[in-house]
Swiss-Prot record:
InterPro entries reported in the protein's UniProt record: GPAT/DHAPAT (IPR022284), GPAT/DHAPAT_C (IPR045520), GPAT/DHAPAT_LPLAT (IPR041728), GPAT_PlsB (IPR028354), Plipid/glycerol_acylTrfase (IPR002123)
Organism this protein belongs to: Vibrio cholerae serotype O1 (strain ATCC 39315 / El Tor Inaba N16961)
An annotated GO BP: fatty acid metabolic process
Membrane association type: Peripheral membrane protein
Matching HAMAP family: Glyc3P_acyltrans
Protein name (database record): Glycerol-3-phosphate acyltransferase
Amino acid sequence: MNSMSSGHLLSRSLLKLPMSVLVKGTAIPSNPIQDLDIDTHKPVIYALPFRSNVDLLTLQTHAKEAGLPDPLEPLMLNGKAFQRYVFIASRPTLLSSDQHVPSDSIALFSELLTEHKLDSELDVQVIPATVLWGRKPGKEGQERPYLQALNGPEKALAVLASGRDCLVRFSPVVSMRYMADTHGTDASIAHKLARVARIHFSRQKLAASGPNLPQRAQLFARLMNSPAIEKAIADEAKSKQIPLEKARKEAHDILDEIAADFSYSLVKKGDRILGWLWNRIYQGLNINNAATVRRLAQDGHEIVYVPCHRSHMDYLLLSYVLYHEGMVPPHIAAGINLNFFPAGPIFRRGGAFFIRRSFKGAPLYSTIFREYLAELFAKGYSVEYFSEGGRSRTGRLLPAKTGMLAMTIQAMLRGLNRPVTLVPVYIGYEHVMEVGTYAKELRGKRKEKENAGLVLRTLRKLRNFGQGYVNFGEPIPLNQFLNETVPQWTQDIDPMGESKPQWMTPTVNKLANRMMTHINDAAAVNAMTLCATALLASRQRALARDNLIKQVDCYLSLLRNVPYSATSTLPSESAEKLVEHAESLDKFVVETDTMGDIISLDRNQSILMTYYRNNIIHLLALPSLIAQLLIRQQSVSLEKVQATVAQIYPFLKQELFLRFEAEELNDLVLRYVAELARQGLVTVEGKTVTLNQAQTQVLMLLGRIISETLQRYAIALNLLVSCPHLGKAELEEKSQEVAQRLGRLHGINAPEFFDKGVFASLFVTLQEQGYLDDQGRCVLETAKPLSRQLYALIYPEVRMTIQESLCQVDA
C-alpha cells in the first residue's frame, strides 16, 4: 500500500507544475458552502467519478479556494485517519477498461458506515464532485455514454485541448448519517451509494453539455418527412395551385430561415469576448437563484426560459450567465428582424432560431415552426423565448404574447416523456443602452430597422453601465400546472400534434399571467431604480441630497422589513452609498449652494428615468397607495385603508402583475402600516392611522409613486360614469385624449401615462370586476362609488383638470 501511495505522491507532484500552467477551471457553484448548504463543522469527503490524479489535483485547487477541506489531507475520526476522497470507477488503461467500483472505495464507504454505527453523533458529508474537461456536446448518431472515463493519453489530450474550459462541479451533499439510519450499514449499502453516485455523475455531464446536437441535414430530412409537414406541403401546393416540388422547396427555405445551427466552438469563443465586454461596460453582474435551475437541469427537466425583454443585450447576457453557471446555453427564439448580416449567422450559431412577427395567413410557415419547436423539446434542448414578444419601451412588464406558450403546451400534447418547466427570468440594468431610442419611439418616431450600422453606432456608445442583474424566478412545472388546471389534459395527447382542445386558450392565458407575475416577483432593486423613483416623485424632479438619501432609505426599509417575494433582490449597501453610486453613472444634474447639494433631472432625463422607475413600481405599489390615502385624508381608520386597498387592488394586480391574492390584503395592509409607523411616518392609535406632520415629505413622495396610475383610473372611471352611453372603443380613445391633455398641463412625462394599451387592459379589468356589463355598458351603482373614491385620492388641481376635460367630452 505504501509503495502505491508513494507512487501516487510522485505522479501528483510531477503533475502540479504543468497543470498550474495548462488548467484554469471554473467552480460551479462559485460559493458551494453557501449554495449547497454545506456544514463546515461536520466532516467532509469527496466522491469523484473516475480514478484520476489530474481530476483530484484540479478538485484540490477549487476546494481550497472555496474554503472547503483539502481532499488530499486525511480525515481524522475518533483517532483514526481516513482518506478524504473516493473514486466511483477505476481508470481505463490502453489495454483494459475496468469500470467497476474500486475495492478501496467500497472498503472506505464500509468503514465510514461502521463508524456511523458506533458513533450516533457522527455525520460525514459526501460531496460528489465532477471535473469536466470541455463541455462540447456530442453529435447525433454518435451514441456514447455522457460521462466517459479517459485513459492516460486521452486525459493528456483533454487537458491540452480543454484545460482552460474545465468545469469543477460540486453537487448537493449526501449525508452518510441519513444513509446509515435509513438503509443500514452493511456492505451492500456501500455498493448502493456508489451506484447512486454514478447515475448522479452522468446527469451532471448531461446538464453541463446538453443532449447530442443534430446534424442540420439529418434534422431537415427528418422534419421534411414528418406527416404534419408533408400534409402542410400538399395543402400549400393545392391552395396556391403550384407544383408539389415548388411547395417542398418553399418549405425547405422556411426551415432554413428558422433553424439554429448551434456551434460549441462559437459559444466558447463568444464566452471570452462577452466576458471582456461585460467587464468593460458593467461594474458587476449579479446572478441570483441559479442553483434552482441547475437542479432542474440535473433532474432531467425540459427547461424553457421565459425572460422579460429590456434590451438586445438580453440575448447575450442570459446565454453568457447560463454558460458560466455550468448549464447549456438555450436555443433562443429571436425576431426575424435580427437576421441581418453579420449578426444573423453569428446569433444562429450561438443557438438562435428565427421567428416571424406574425403567422397569420401562412399555414405552411406555422406548421413548420410548430414542428421545429416540438423537435427541440423532444430532443431535450433547453429553449428560451421572450414572453412579452418584444422589448418593453416603458420599463414595465408588457402583457404576454401567448403564441409560443400555446406551442409549448401543444408540444406537451404529443406525449413528451420528460417534465417541462418554465423558468421565469428577470433581467435588470442600471443603464439600458436603447432607452433614448425607446423614448423617441414612444413620441411617435418610427423604429429604426436593425442593421450592421446600428450595431456599430451602439457599440460606440458602450461605456460605464453600472450593474447588471439576472434573477431566476420561481419555476412553473407545466405538468403540475396542467394537472391542477385541467386534470383531464392527458386525454388530449395526440402524437400528430393536431390537438387543439377547448381548454387551451383559457389555460394558456392563466399560465401567461402566472408566468409574468413570477417574472415581476424576481425583480432586482438597484441604486438607479431607487433614485429614479424618488426624484420622479418630487414635483420639480429635484431633491436635496439629504432628502434623496432619506427617501431611498424609506423605500429600502419598506422592502427589507415587508419583503415583496422570496425571489426579489435588494442591494446590501446603505442609502447613502447607493445615491453615491447612482450619481457616478452620470445621469443627474448636481448643483451646490450654501446649504448643500441639490440633485435633479433635466427634462430629457426625466423621461428616460421613468423607464427605471417602472422596473420596480410594482414592488412599491401597495405601500404607495396607503401613503397616498393618508396624505389626502390625514387621519383614517384601518378598516377604511383596508377597504380602499381591496377596491383598487384588482386594477393594480392586472396592470402590474402583482402577486397577492385578495384574501392576503388585510394582513398585508397591517404589516405595511406597522412599518410606516416604525419609520415614524404615521402613528397608530387604536384603529386609527394618522400621518406624522413632521415627516409629510417622505410620505408624500412615497404616495406620489402611484399617483399617476390613480389619475389614469380616475379619468377612465369618471368618463365611464359621465358618458355611460359610450362604447368600449370610444371610452378607450376619449380616456387617452384626456390623459394626454392632463399630461401636458401637469408636466407628466411618463410615456405609459397615455398609452392606449394600458387603457385597453384597464377596461378589460373593469368588465371582469363588474363595473361594465356583458354588453360593455356602465353599471352605475358599482362604478359611481369607485369614481368618487378615485377623485378623493388624487390632488385637487388634477381633479379639476379631469372634470373640465370631461365636461368638454360630454359637450
